[in-house]
């Protein structure tokens, strides 16, 4: 990732409007800022959320609160708790997210 032509700025995430995305079950609320080619999001998954697709996009993802289960298409699963993160490249392992009780994430892609 190359970050250029981006002056210093501050984001108050509580002031960024949320956009709801339905999952197979539950919903995700995205608060999104776009900085050139870099998308930065604060995301809340509701309890019982299951993503409706296998994602192929690369991300840096940090769990801020709650627990996230990330499943890879090869069957591996990972439980992430607050302070844990993962990183994956574009087109690398297909992955999808779920949570039993809800989770808050910070994602850069």
Language model features with spans:
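Ligand-binding loop in jelly-roll beta-barrel domains
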Residues: 77, 81-84, 89-109
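Conserved hydrophobic/aromatic beta-strand scaffold that supports enzyme active sites
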Residues: 32, 40-42, 60, 77, ...
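A short, N-terminal "cap"/entry segment at the start of jelly-roll beta-barrel domains
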Residues: 1-42
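Short, acidic/polar N-cap/turn motifs at the starts of alpha helices
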Residues: 28-30, 40, 58, 67, ...
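General beta-strand recognition
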Residues: 39, 69, 104-106
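Conserved short histidine dyad/triad with adjacent acidic residue
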Residues: 36-55, 80, 89-92
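A short beta-strand-loop-beta hairpin characteristic of the jelly-roll/cupin
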Residues: 53-56, 60-82
């Amino acid at each position: 990732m190359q970050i250029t032509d981006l002056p210093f700025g501050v984001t108050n995430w509580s002031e960024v409007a949320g956009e709801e995305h339905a999952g197979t079950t539950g919903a995700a609320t995205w608060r999104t800022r776009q900085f050139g080619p870099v998308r930065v999001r604060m995301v809340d998954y509701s309890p019982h959320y299951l993503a409706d697709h296998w994602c192929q996009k690369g991300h840096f993802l940090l769990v801020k609160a709650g627990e996230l289960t990330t499943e890879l298409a090869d069957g591996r699963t990972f439980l992430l708790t607050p302070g844990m993160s993962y990183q994956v490249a574009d087109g690398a392992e297909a992955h999808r997210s779920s949570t039993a009780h809800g989770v808050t994430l910070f994602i850069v892609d």
